[in-house]
Amino acid sequence: MPSNSGDDNVLQVLIKNFDVLALPLVTLVYPLYASVKAIETRSLPEDEQWLTYWVLYALISLFELTFSKPLEWFPIWPYMKLFGICWLVLPQFNGAEHIYKHFIRPFYRDPQRATTKIWYVPHKKFNFFPKRDDDDILTAAEKYMEQHGTEAFERMIVKKDSYERGRSSRGINNHMIFDDDYRY
C-alpha cells in the first residue's frame, strides 16, 4: 500500500511539535480532570496532591515568566519542563508531594531557617572517598594496643602465628591459587 504524503506530513508535524501538543495535556487537561475528580471523591490525599501540584505549577509559571529570555537559549527547556511536570503529575512518582514536603513547606513554616539551609556552604572540602578509620589495619592495631597494651597485641600475633604453623604441620593447607607459594 503506497503511503500518502499528506499522512507523512501530518506525522512529521506531530513529531516535531510533540512538546507543544503534549505540554498542555500534561500540565492542564489531566490535572484539571484529576482535580475535579479529587474534589468529588472528597479524598484528602488526592486533594493534597492536586493542590500541591497547582502550587508548583504556579511557581513554574512564575519562573518561566521571570526568566523567559534566558530560557529561549535552551532549546531543551520545553522537554525538561514536560518530563518534570510528568514527574509531578503521575501518581507513581508522587513528585509534587516530595517537592512540597522537602522544599516549599520548610520555607513556608520557617523562612529564616529555610534560607539558611539554602545558602549554607560547608567549610570542609568534600571527599568522595572518605577514609574510614575502621578499615585501616594500622589504625585498628593502634586502637587495640591502646586498649589492651602492646603485650596483649604481641601475644595475639604469636598465638595466631603458632595456630597457622600447627595447621600447616597437620597437613591443612589453606593456600589460594594466587598465593606466591601455591604449588600446582
UniProtKB/Swiss-Prot annotation:
<dbReference type="GO" id="GO:0009506">
    <property type="term" value="C:plasmodesma"/>
</dbReference>
<dbReference type="InterPro" id="IPR004345">
    <property type="entry name" value="TB2_DP1_HVA22"/>
</dbReference>
<comment type="similarity">
    <text>Belongs to the DP1 family.</text>
</comment>
<protein>
    <recommendedName>
        <fullName>HVA22-like protein c</fullName>
    </recommendedName>
</protein>
<keyword id="KW-0472">Membrane</keyword>
<dbReference type="GO" id="GO:0009414">
    <property type="term" value="P:response to water deprivation"/>
</dbReference>
<keyword id="KW-0812">Transmembrane</keyword>
<feature type="transmembrane region" description="Helical">
    <location>
        <begin position="13"/>
        <end position="33"/>
    </location>
</feature>
<dbReference type="Pfam" id="PF03134">
    <property type="entry name" value="TB2_DP1_HVA22"/>
</dbReference>
<feature type="transmembrane region" description="Helical">
    <location>
        <begin position="73"/>
        <end position="93"/>
    </location>
</feature>
<keyword id="KW-1133">Transmembrane helix</keyword>
<dbReference type="GO" id="GO:0042538">
    <property type="term" value="P:hyperosmotic salinity response"/>
</dbReference>
<dbReference type="GO" id="GO:0009737">
    <property type="term" value="P:response to abscisic acid"/>
</dbReference>
<dbReference type="GO" id="GO:0016020">
    <property type="term" value="C:membrane"/>
</dbReference>
<feature type="transmembrane region" description="Helical">
    <location>
        <begin position="51"/>
        <end position="71"/>
    </location>
</feature>
